Regions:
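Positively charged n-region of N-terminal signal peptides that target proteins for export
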Residues: 1-7
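Hydrophobic helical h-region of N-terminal Sec-dependent signal peptides
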Residues: 7-15
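Sec/Tat signal peptide C-region and signal peptidase I cleavage site
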Residues: 17-24
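Low-complexity repeat regions of mature extracellularly deployed or surface/particle-associated proteins
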Residues: 24-144
């Protein structure tokens, strides 16, 4: 009897652990330098946040509410800031900032929106706001 209980408990635990990654959210961070900051929140499932910061005094925040959203931020240099907010399902947002003193705010409210952009140089600013579904936006800025 005890043997059957142990086997049943072990089987239930393995099934539960096997089902977890299929609906789990994920976050990866890779920060170099010093005084870089990253934060985020995820509500739903299959959401992904990725942040790579190389330099100093960079900041990134990502917030996701829904399912299947992806937010990626790459920053190289110093004093760059990125904020990505995703509300809905299957939104994809990516920001690359190379240089210094850049700011990007990316907001996606809906389903299946795609936005990506790059800022190069010093002191660029971008504010992307997508409402509804199926929107696509891309930007490239070079600032002195």
């Amino acid at each position: 009897m005890t043997r059957n209980i142990i086997i049943a408990t072990a089987t239930a635990a393995l099934i539960g652990l096997g089902a977890l990654p299929a609906s789990a959210n994920s976050v990866w961070l890779d920060q170099h330098g010093y005084s870089n900051q990253a934060g985020g929140s995820q509500s739903g499932f299959n959401n992904v946040i990725g942040v790579l910061q190389n330099g100093v005094f960079n900041g990134a925040i990502s917030q996701q509410n829904g399912h299947g959203n992806t937010a990626a931020t790459g920053q190289q240099g110093y004093n760059n800031y990125s904020n990505t907010y995703q509300q809905g399902n299957y939104n994809q947002g990516g920001v690359g900032q190379f240089g210094s003193n850049h700011t990007t705010i990316l907001t996606q409210d809906g389903n299946g929106n795609i936005a990506a952009g790059v800022q190069v140089g010093n002191g660029c600013s971008a504010n992307i706001d997508q409402a509804g579904s199926g929107n696509v936006a891309a930007f490239v800025q070079t600032c002195p």
